[in-house]
């Protein structure tokens, strides 16, 4: 049997609260698909530009040589969007490091970090659990002295 050459691909994830997005990035023609649909069709439309931030920052020429397939689940709309943009940015950096060259990877990383650090680094904040004696994590029920 003839062995197939290994495809140049990387897999990266992005997280925000409980939303997780996994991006498969491989050599291609610049297609970006989100849950099987083109990323241009993502709803809600207002949040679509947040997803396009890595593309707009780095220019389409850097994405022209790669295809990205993104799967996202968990969380709400906004959390999913932040997880998606993080996974896109991390996948492109990893692809350039592994298959292109270290210099262009460093340029990409510097541009992204200068704009918004959360494009590459996850936000560690999580929801605090509710405690007894109140409605939420910190608020307490009203106290009466008389």
Swiss-Prot record:
It is found in: Cytoplasm. Pfam families: Ribosomal_S9. GO terms for molecular function: mRNA binding; structural constituent of ribosome. It comes from the Eukaryota. SUPFAM superfamilies: Ribosomal protein S5 domain 2-like. GO terms for cellular component: chloroplast; cytosolic small ribosomal subunit; plasmodesma; plastid. PROSITE patterns: RIBOSOMAL_S9. InterPro entries: Ribosomal_Su5_D2-typ_SF (IPR020568), Ribosomal_uS9 (IPR000754), Ribosomal_uS9_CS (IPR020574), Ribsml_uS5_D2-typ_fold_subgr (IPR014721). GO terms for biological process: translation. Keywords: Cytoplasm, Ribonucleoprotein, Ribosomal protein. Belongs to the universal ribosomal protein uS9 family. This is Small ribosomal subunit protein uS9x. It comes from Arabidopsis thaliana.
């Amino acid at each position: 049997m003839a062995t197939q050459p290994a495809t140049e691909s990387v897999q990266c994830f992005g997280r925000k609260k409980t939303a997780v997005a996994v991006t498969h990035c491989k050599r291609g023609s610049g297609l970006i698909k989100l849950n099987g649909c083109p990323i241009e069709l993502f709803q809600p439309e207002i949040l679509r530009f947040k997803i396009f931030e890595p593309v707009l920052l780095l220019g389409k020429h850097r994405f022209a040589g790669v295809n990205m397939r993104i799967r996202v689940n968990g969380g709400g709309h906004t959390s999913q969007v932040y997880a998606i943009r993080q996974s896109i940015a991390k996948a492109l950096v990893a692809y350039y490091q592994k298959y292109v060259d270290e210099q262009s990877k460093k340029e990409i990383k510097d541009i992204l970090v200068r704009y918004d650090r959360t494009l590459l680094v996850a936000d560690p904040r999580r929801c605090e659990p509710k405690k007894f004696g109140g409605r939420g994590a910190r608020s307490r029920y009203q106290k009466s002295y008389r």
